[in-house]
Amino acid sequence: MNKYEYAVASESVVLESLGFEFVRDLSPGEGLFIDSSGSIFLEQCSDKPELTPCIFEHVYFARPDSMMDDISVYKCRLRMGDRLAKKIIRTNPGYTIDVVIPIPDTSRQSAQALAETLGVKLREGFMKNRYIGRTFIMPGQKERKKSVRQKLSPVKLEFSGKNVLLVDDSIAVSYTHLRAHETS
């Protein structure tokens, strides 16, 4: 009987939080097999292995303190915000933005970098109800709309009389954006 424990996860932070050592990422199309005696086998299972990462992993699903495919999720999100800010400067040099507000939570790092690059204040304009889950993966449209209404509560002081740039991680289903617009 093997005396070792094994864990396999898509994010490094899971392994770290459970006290496991990160060994390596699996290659595209690679399978990992652990038999009943604890022996590990790696096998290429695809005829045409190709890395095709899901954009939502780094942008939305992954925790910012994770490494995925040897890329820091936190650093990736900071770079996205910086690049968006540079695009704003390039395409709209006379921009008038008083405040940058992230839609909680995963857009926070991008909003931080964007605000810093633009030289604009970063503010928390929404308080998130921690008991409402991810709204875009809820089963029906009615359920999603109801949950979005309950999910974000605006800090009206941060919106009143200001040109606000809202930063979100992605637009999968735009109910959150509609709610954010209604409240501001």
Where are these regions (language model features)?
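Conserved small/polar residues in nucleotide/adenosyl-binding loops
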Residues: 176-183
